[in-house]
């Protein structure tokens, strides 16, 4: 089994419950293809670098998992047909250095999940 990271962006028009349901759907696909989900990093609502499907913002989520090559095709097929997902990217970690970095990312994602959420900081604006 190889190490993979999939980042996907969900439409910003969804409610929190709908967004959580879409993320759960993708996690269910991982379970169906016998992928081992190691960590999830919910990055939250962010501004996109450029408009995608007339959206300037999106809800980012990163999944770290181990799976075989055939599973990736099914995961990406489900991401393509999901109308709520506006963009996605899957990265395969192959070399030892890449796998070491993958392990660090998984540890950081699990650590941030265990830590209590910090209060959002107020944005500063210059006059």
Swiss-Prot record:
Gene Ontology BP term (one): translation
Gene Ontology molecular function, alphabetical:
small ribosomal subunit rRNA binding; structural constituent of ribosome
* One Gene Ontology CC term in the entry: ribosome
Name the Gene3D superfamilies for this protein. 3.30.70.60
Species this chain originates from: Sulfurovum sp. (strain NBC37-1)
Q: What is the lineage of its organism?
A: Bacteria, Pseudomonadati, Campylobacterota, Epsilonproteobacteria, Campylobacterales
Keyword annotations of the record: Ribonucleoprotein, Ribosomal protein, RNA-binding, rRNA-binding
Q: What is this protein called?
A: Small ribosomal subunit protein bS6
The UniProt entry, under CDD domains, shows: bS6 (cd00473)
> What is the annotated role of this protein in its UniProt record?
Binds together with bS18 to 16S ribosomal RNA.
